[in-house]
């Protein structure tokens, strides 16, 4: 039975409405705050106009770096909540982010294994000592995350890229045998690299392409009680150069981006 973590979230919703007066357009902004402490869609003080401090000149003919995309994250908790809505309302939300009539998200992120936005702690490799990952399974994602991604894919006309990030390796691969903190044991670097490759294959079997990875979420640690694992820059360089990169190349996944 999955246990939903109750997160204390202060949500500020900005509701923007346009009003037109003849040929001059103005923008009206209303700020509403909701929090667990008691505010229930409470209006807060409106913005006051300040004096301009900067002047921005836009020149579309002069370009520099290319943006890969804009977007947000697919998480187990958000997918779980989305699944509790009616089919009609769920589709409205998906369309608001991914459809042509919506924000048209083009770059997204999801988590490998559980994260602080999961309903509980889990790993795709739960069996201790399974260094060949014979028991690897993404079954946990099939209830929530994967259906949400597929609905987004159906709504998106141009498609979007997915970056996947682990918060932690399974505890049995770590020097502290815990979900929180600790480091990946050097003797499990090769197993952890194989984990990434198997993850790509498992999602591919579900019809979902993984575009790239970040090696670790918050590799310097976050000091909190949710899933984490730590790397020094030297350790991460070693892992990517000598284990993850070669494993992906060997398995025909050399086109995957490592960020």
Language-model features: where?
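N-terminal catalytic cores of secreted or lumenal carbohydrate-active enzymes
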Residues: 37-210, 231-234, 242
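Bacterial Sec-dependent N-terminal signal peptides
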Residues: 1-26
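Boundary/junction segments of secreted and surface-exposed precursor proteins
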Residues: 27-32
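Secondary-structure transition/capping motifs at alpha-helix termini
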Residues: 1, 157-158, 204-209, 246-255
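Short secondary-structure boundary/hinge segments and terminal tails
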Residues: 21-22, 118, 221
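Polysaccharide-binding and catalytic clefts of secreted carbohydrate-active enzymes
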Residues: 113, 216-239
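Aromatic-lined carbohydrate-recognition surfaces of secreted/lumenal glycan-active proteins
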Residues: 163-166, 211-217, 233, 241-259
